[in-house]
Amino acid sequence: MLKIKLFSLVAIPFLFLSSYTSYAGDKYTITGAVENVSYNNSPTWPCYIAVDGEDDGKGGRRNYFHAANNTSICGLAERAKILNYRVKIYAEVDTGANIVYQIEFANTQSKYWDRASR
């Protein structure tokens, strides 16, 4: 009886904690058209990118704004929007924000990624 109580005291809180923390750090991809690139006056997050497309089925955020921490990612997204190219973004959830760490043109696979954030 003592072993069961001890197990439940240790295991149940761990299960709740693991299900909560698995959301942060989740990675997903979205392929689609760039709907908007919104610039921000911040060196940390210079722009936000909205992609209208299909997610990978792993909880991707379709039509949400994704923070980009590098101006090169913003530039490639802006070019894709102007040229009406489809893009594929690789993003991850980090403390409630959706952060783009790699972006590429979907048809040519020309890409930019920020190695520092990986």
Curated annotation (Swiss-Prot):
This is Putative protein p10. It comes from Acyrthosiphon pisum secondary endosymbiont phage 1 (Bacteriophage APSE-1).
